[in-house]
Amino acid sequence: MSTPALTYSVRDRSILLPYYKRFLVEPLIPLIPARISPNAITHGGHLVNLAALALLVASAPMDKGWPFFFVPVLVHVWLWCDHADGGHARRTGQCSALGEFLDHGLDLLNATYVICMTVVALGTPPFWSVTAAVVVPAAAAITYWEQAETGVFQLGLLNQIESVCSLSVALTARGLFGVAAIAAIHVGSWPLPDLVLAVVSVVALFGILRCAMRVKQKGGRLAPFVAPLLFGIAVTLAAATGALGTLSAILVGASVYVFVGVCQLNFRIRGERPQPQAGVLVAAVVVFGVAGYRMRIGVVPAALEWGAAGVLTSVFGGLALVRGIEGHRAVEELDRAKAASA
């Protein structure tokens, strides 16, 4: 990147990415009219992915059928847009700080959509659904923290393209055979949906720990990592004890980690080192409190569960939006400054 505040290096070890770009993206980029804004491609892809999530959630009560074949088509449209926008920007000379910010910011949301769709496709097994749907956006947020601390954007062997391909297989199986048939498959004592989500959770958790280790090795500060870590433990405990149900735990976990990720992007834009987020620590205390109530009393009233979940989701969802707007304005200012100095 040419803007100092946004300068970083990328280490992408994705297995499928080189082949995906070579055969499915690069040959088609010249067909995109030069007048189309790369940011329009980014926004369009995000909206298509959001529509896929909405359609799948609406179709969740169905055992099988056409929605489970159509949703993968929408998801692959988004995936293509997400990889074509940068190439189109470079080809047409439309690269910008705003485009880079949108790409990373919306990737945080899109990663959350993809794991939530995976959970729905597999029939939403209770505990592992929460674990996977929370730890994946957490991993994305922690990756942005590492990027802000070290200036290196690290992506693992199993990433976006691999996740979408796996989701496509799960959706196709759901469409053909239904959720009961998938749940009936066991690997040892593990139902297949539980095993898949457990593996996803462990891989993402390993990625989080590797991020923290790399930051420490490069002399970065681990203090900003503490609150997100405690919050993750709190949500896991709340889900394991039944203090929070599947939906409420996913909403709370995803909203807090999206907020964390957007904050890390903003720190990098401003050229600042990440700071601890006191609000995330407060959220962890609240969730620990709900879990503690469940363990002491034996039951959490629905009003308490959804009251706590509703407040946390609304507050951190709203704060993520505010921080996103702040970042949007900041990169627009960077683009204007770059244009003025050109």
Model-derived features with residue positions:
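Membrane-embedded alpha-helical segments that form the functional core of polytopic membrane enzymes
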Residues: 42-98, 114-118, 126-139, 191-202
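Transmembrane alpha-helical core residues of multi-pass small-molecule transporters
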Residues: 48, 106-107, 135-139, 162, ...
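Membrane-interface helix starts
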Residues: 34-44
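Alpha-helical transmembrane segments that form the membrane-embedded catalytic/substrate-binding core
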Residues: 100-114, 159-166
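Juxtamembrane helix-capping/reentrant segments at transmembrane boundaries
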Residues: 29-30, 85, 89, 93-106, ...
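Generic alpha-helical transmembrane segments of integral inner-membrane proteins
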Residues: 47-54, 109, 169-176
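C-terminal membrane-associated helical module and adjoining short loops/tails
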Residues: 1-32, 140-144, 150-342
